[in-house]
Amino acid sequence: MEITIVAVGKIKERYLKEGIAEYLKRLSPYARLAVIEVDDENAPENLSPAEAEKVVKKEGERILAKITPSSFVIALDLKGKNLSSEEFAHFISEKNLYGQSKLTFIIGGSLGLSREVLERADFKLSFGRMTYPHQLMRLILLEQIYRAFKIIRGEPYHK
């Protein structure tokens, strides 16, 4: 299975870089993983709705340019479907079973994802109604993908 994570912005915090590197290493026996970072737009604090939309649209164009046509696209979105870890494992397993071996997860920037990116998504996934920093979300997503593979293989880890 090939999994790509397309994420807006660069990770600056060392502890996040180390956590991400650890899960990428742990995932290597299960899938080929790639993390693609696209530049975030410079956005001052008090943006008007029109300015915010421009920022999200520009980031969205960068995201869409990184998605391969054959990939099944999963956008992380507050309005997406909530899945338990077991349901997420089943979801990944089913995609692989039915020949969808390329998955692309999309993590937007601090202002979210553009309408165009959400329309391109084949599935919208939510990690709950809480808001997380998009940099931290990358680590959380990788941990859940790792957990899913452990569940799929019946290997110890998941409690």
UniProtKB/Swiss-Prot annotation:
The protein's Enzyme Commission number: 2.1.1.177
Keywords for the protein's UniProt record, in alphabetical order: Cytoplasm, Methyltransferase, rRNA processing, S-adenosyl-L-methionine, Transferase
GO cellular component annotations of the record: cytoplasm
GO molecular function, one term: rRNA (pseudouridine-N3-)-methyltransferase activity
Class of the enzyme per the UniProt entry, highest EC level: transferase
Catalysis: reaction(s): pseudouridine(1915) in 23S rRNA + S-adenosyl-L-methionine = N(3)-methylpseudouridine(1915) in 23S rRNA + S-adenosyl-L-homocysteine + H(+)
Chain positions recorded as S-adenosyl-L-methionine binding sites: 76, 108, 127-132
Subcellular location: Cytoplasm
Organism domain of life: Bacteria
Cross-referenced HAMAP family: 23SrRNA_methyltr_H (MF_00658)
Family: Belongs to the RNA methyltransferase RlmH family.
Assembly, per entry: Homodimer.
Role, per record: Specifically methylates the pseudouridine at position 1915 (m3Psi1915) in 23S rRNA.
Record-given protein name: Ribosomal RNA large subunit methyltransferase H
